[in-house]
A protein has these predicted regions:
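Core catalytic lobe of class I
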Residues: 1-216
Length: 216
C-alpha cells in the first residue's frame, strides 16, 4: 500500500489509465467551517475517476445530506444504489432543538457497468431456502414459481450497515471511519490483489483495511 501526502489533483496525472479496481473514499461534505471540508470540483474529479478506473471497477463514496444529493446528481449515469450507514450514536447536539440528531451517513455506489460484488453474508435463524424460476408469463419479473430446497442460515446484506462510529477520543481525523466498516466495503467491492484508491486519505483507514486484506 502506498501513501502520498499531496493534493489529489496533482497526483492523478501519475496514475495510469484503467489501473484502479475500486475507488473508496470519504470526500469532504462541505458542511462545516473547517478549511479541509471544501467540496472538490466534482466534474474535474469524475474526469479523473473515469480515466483511471477499470471498466469493471466501482466508485464507493461517503456522503451526507445535502452533499449526497449533489454527489449523486454529479454522475447519475453511473449511480447504482446507496447504503445507509447506521452509526448507532447521533451527532449534532447543538442543533437538537431544531432538527433530529444525525445518526446515519450515506454511501453511494457508482459504476460504469457490471462490477465486483462480494455480498458479506451474516448468520441468522435457519429457514427454508427457496429457488425460483420465471415462467413464460411475463409480469415485472415473470410468474415466479417457488420451490423449497433446503434449510439455510446465511442471510444476504440489506442496505443498512450497522457499525458504531470510531471512538472520538482515539480519532486521528475528525471524520475518521471505523476500520471494520472500511474492511466490509473493501471485501464487498474488491478481491485479493486488487488495487484500491482513496484520494482523500484522512487517517488512512482505507489503506489499513487494504493492507490487512491483501489489497494494493
Amino acid at each position: 500500500s502506498t501513501f502520498v501526502n499531496a493534493d489529489c489533483f496533482d497526483v492523478f496525472p501519475f496514475i495510469e489509465d484503467k489501473s484502479i479496481d475500486a475507488i473508496i473514499a470519504d470526500l469532504p461534505y462541505g458542511t462545516t467551517q473547517n478549511k479541509w471540508d471544501s467540496i472538490l470540483p466534482l466534474n474535474k474529479l469524475w474526469k479523473e475517476y473515469k480515466r483511471i478506473l477499470k471498466d469493471s471497477g466501482c466508485v464507493v463514496l461517503f456522503a451526507q445530506t445535502p452533499f449526497d444529493k449533489v454527489l449523486g446528481c454529479s454522475n447519475l449515469d453511473w449511480l447504482k444504489y446507496e447504503w445507509i450507514w447506521d452509526k448507532k450514536l447521533g451527532s449534532g447536539s447543538l442543533n437538537v432543538k431544531k432538527m433530529p440528531l444525525k445518526r446515519h451517513e450515506n454511501i453511494l455506489v457508482f459504476s460504469k457497468g457490471k462490477t465486483t460484488y462480494n455480498p458479506q453474508m451474516t448468520k441468522g435463524k435457519f429457514r427454508n431456502k427457496s429457488t425460483s424460476k420465471p415462467s413464460s408469463n411475463k409480469g415485472n419479473y415473470g410468474e415466479i414459481t417457488h420451490q423449497k430446497d433446503n434449510f439455510n442460515d446465511d442471510y444476504y446484506p440489506t442496505t443498512i450497515l450497522e457499525f458504531t462510529n470510531a471512538n472520538v477520543r482515539a480519532r486521528v481525523h475528525p471524520t475518521e471511519k471505523q476500520l471494520s466498516l472500511m474492511e466490509y466495503l473493501v471485501k464487498t467491492y474488491t478481491n485479493e490483489g486488487d488495487t484500491v484508491l482513496d484520494n482523500t486519505m484522512g487517517s488512512g483507514t482505507t489503506n489499513l483495511a487494504c493492507i490487512k486484506l491483501n489489497r494494493k
